[in-house]
Structure formats: C-alpha cells, structure tokens
Amino acid sequence: METKDLKKLAKAELHCHLDGSLSLDTIRQLAALAQVDVPQDDSELKQLVTAPETCGSLMDYLKTFDFIRPLLQTPQALTLAAYDVVKQAALENVIYIEIRFAPELSMDQGLTATQVVEAVLKGLEQGQKEFGIVAKAIVCGMRQSSLDISREIFANVLEWANKGLVGFDFAGNELDFPPAVLADLIKETQAYGLPFTLHAGECGCPNYIVDAIDLGIKRLGHVTAIHNQKDLLAKFIANDVTAELCFTSNLQTKAARTVEDFPYMQLRQAGAKLSINTDNRTVSDTNLTKEYELFVKHFETSVSDFLEHNRDAIKASFTSPAEKEALLARLDKAYQSYIKK
C-alpha cells in the first residue's frame, strides 16, 4: 500500500508518551511560555528532541526527555501539549488513543499530581471535541523514583478515574527496577479498580515479562525480550495478554538489535494479540503511518492484519465496554472498502 492509503486507514494506539510526542510548533509555543530559548532553525531544534537512530541503550534514549521536562510545568502547557498529541493522531486517522504521562515530571514548580492530570485531561477533551477522536489518559509512575512518591500520586489522581483517566503504568529504568520491586504497589493500585499496563521486556529480560504476567497484567509494553522464548510466548497467549509493540523505538534503543530480533512475526504467527504503536512520536521521529509503512516493508503486513491488530488494540483498551463496541463498529466500517479490494 502507498503512504496515502496507509494514512487513511483507521487506527488505534495504546502506547504513546505525551512528553515524547510533541510537535516542533508546540515545543516552540511551550518554550515561549516557559521563557526557555530554543534554536530558531527547525533542524537544530529537532536534533535536541529526537533520539539518534541508534542509541547505546534505553537510558541514552531517555536522556532526550530532559529538554522537554521544564516546558511542561504549568496547566496551560500541559493542556496545550495534550491537545497537540491528540491532533497529530487524529490527522492520521487514529480513532482511539491512550496517552501516557508521569505527573511527577511536571511537579517541579509546585503543581500537584491532581492538577497535572486535570490539565492533561482538559487538552484531551479539547482534541476529542475538535477532531472526533476518542482520547484517554494513563498515569505513569517512574520506576527509579521512590515508591512512596508513586503511591501518593496514584492515590491522589483517582478522582479522575473514568473521567478520562483509564489506567496506570510504570515507565523509566526497567533494568534496575524490575516488576518484583514494584509488585506490592501494583497490587495495591490494582485494588482501586483501574487496570495496569507495564513496560516489560524492553531491557532484554524475559523474566520481567513472566513477572508482569504473574501480576495479572493483561497489557505489556514492548515485550521485545519475548523473541525466541517459546515457553514464554505460550504463557503470554494462555494468559490472554496483549502486546504494545513499538518497532522504531526498539531498534533505536537496541531492545531489538536487528529487525530479525523484533518479536512481531513470532507473536503474529503464534496468534498472540498485539497492537502497533509509536511510543514517542517526536523522540523516535515517527507516527503510526510511518510505523505501518515499516511493517509492510519488513513483515509484509496486510490490510487484514492491520484490521486485526487494531481490533486487538481496541479490545485491550482501557475504555468502557460500550465505547469499545462503538469503536470496533467504526473500525470495521472504515476497513470495508479496503478489505474488499
């Protein structure tokens, strides 16, 4: 399929980080609001906010976020940022998106976690009204931070549960802060009633995927380390887990050292549930259309495959059953003319 046709396909995205997905125009607006100087030249600015095609590691990739952090410290900035990412998604026919962010990273200048979430939800709502997309929020704890900080944030933001906030996650340094370290807090938070997704297996540790599944988590981000792990793949499928795959990002961070090391084909051939995601639109210089192009190029993914993956994404999404039903109907209708071809 040509790029224009891939762009027209209806899409769902489950794994998109707010601070890693801001457009250059919005970064300029945010910098002006924060009174931070940025390069006038777009290519120079892009270099500051985009990770190299090949990073030494995940931690090298994550350094790129340091530039954005000071720009997301006010309600106005957070609302603008959330609206921007929803707009970008809608313009490439994403009908459903879950945008994740860590309130802790926007609390440097006095905002509370509740205020951060409120501001982000306001931006999501503006984008939904303007573009006809459904956009929800996932709150992340940072793995490398004190568990008490994350515990307090998770408890405080519960007032937004099912008012746009639909789930929780842990992001950051997976290698040194595995699921075992987070397990008690994850169990506590699950008891509140909102589901968890979790970055797992991005650092080359299959046992972290095992631990996440054993915590009852039904969606896992990346799962790159499941490659060539036959027993783990069987466990993944038996537990009805959905993978949030991030191809470009995984190649950058060396989670997958080569295309052949990326687990998509093994997951697909085994019948595992999966979704295709950007991870970070700006940091990885990508969007869903570009990701779809890469899947066609490297894996010969078909329109029928994309429909199936998007159906998996919506079914595994954290929105309400009624909204899932409406989104699935919208998705199926959007693909009818392409499938007939």
UniProtKB/Swiss-Prot annotation:
SUPFAM superfamilies assigned to the protein according to its UniProt record, in alphabetical order: Metallo-dependent hydrolases (SSF51556)
GO cellular component: cytosol
Binding site for substrate: 17, 19, 172
Active site, renumbered: 202 (proton donor)
EC numbers: 3.5.4.4
Site (Important for catalytic activity) location in chain: 222
Catalytic reaction equation(s): adenosine + H2O + H(+) = inosine + NH4(+); 2'-deoxyadenosine + H2O + H(+) = 2'-deoxyinosine + NH4(+)
Residues noted as binding Zn(2+) in the record, renumbered to the chain: 15, 17, 199, 279
Record's keyword annotation contains Cytoplasm: no
InterPro entries: A_deaminase, A_deaminase_dom, Ado/ade_deaminase, Metal_Hydrolase
Keywords: Hydrolase, Metal-binding, Nucleotide metabolism, Zinc
Enzyme class: hydrolase
Family per record: Belongs to the metallo-dependent hydrolases superfamily. Adenosine and AMP deaminases family. Adenosine deaminase subfamily.
Stated name of the protein: Adenosine deaminase
Origin species: Streptococcus equi subsp. zooepidemicus (strain MGCS10565)
